[in-house]
């Protein structure tokens, strides 16, 4: 038997309750975008997901149900910043944009840079290779519009 002398890989920090809520909301939105099931059915399915009990339940509910309820308005808010029709977005990109747009509009207690970073992380974790760059660019432009004062103060 040989001993492994390689340096120990640092453990990733534990996910925050809000990050778990965002991940679960993205998964729920993905399901909803694909089959338009009743939001209650989508949510019930997610209750069995690993980590659901560690998620910020209130934030999850707000993101999932709020993004579904306001899907048309949220999509309309970021559509001017797209370089292609909404129908051509991957479901993961679209779900990440919905989560980010919802937080930018409704969760003003969360700094816009945090909102964008979290949406980018969702796209990196669940999306295609370059999708996160697209999500970043679209949400950055949306933030400049819906949180103009905050963005101007930070730049």
UniProtKB/Swiss-Prot annotation:
A Gene Ontology biological process term: transcription antitermination
Molecular function terms from GO: RNA binding
Keyword Transcription set for record: yes
Domain of life where this protein originates: Bacteria
Signal peptide: none
Keyword terms of this UniProt record: RNA-binding, Transcription, Transcription antitermination, Transcription regulation
Gene3D superfamilies recorded: NusB-like (1.10.940.10)
Keyword hit for Transcription: yes
Any single Gene Ontology cellular-component annotation: cytosol
InterPro entries in alphabetical order: NusB-like_sf (IPR035926), NusB_fam (IPR011605), NusB_RsmB_TIM44 (IPR006027)
Family assignment from sequence similarity: Belongs to the NusB family.
Function: Involved in transcription antitermination. Required for transcription of ribosomal RNA (rRNA) genes. Binds specifically to the boxA antiterminator sequence of the ribosomal RNA (rrn) operons.
Protein name: Transcription antitermination protein NusB
């Amino acid at each position: 038997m040989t001993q492994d002398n390689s340096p120990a890989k640092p453990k990733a920090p534990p996910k925050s309750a809000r990050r778990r809520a965002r991940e679960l909301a993205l998964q729920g939105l993905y399901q909803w975008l694909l089959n338009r099931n009743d939001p209650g059915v989508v949510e019930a399915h997610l209750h069995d997901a690993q980590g659901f009990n560690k998620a910020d339940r209130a934030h999850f509910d707000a993101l999932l149900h709020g993004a579904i309820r306001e899907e048309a308005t949220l999509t309309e808010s970021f559509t001017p910043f797209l370089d292609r029709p909404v129908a051509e977005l991957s479901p993961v990109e679209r779900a990440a944009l919905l989560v980010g747009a919802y937080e930018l509009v409704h969760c003003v207690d969360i700094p816009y840079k945090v909102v964008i970073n979290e949406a980018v992380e969702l796209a990196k974790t669940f999306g295609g290779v370059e999708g996160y760059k697209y999500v970043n660019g679209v949400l950055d432009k949306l933030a400049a519009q819906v949180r103009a004062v905050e963005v101007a103060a930070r730049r």
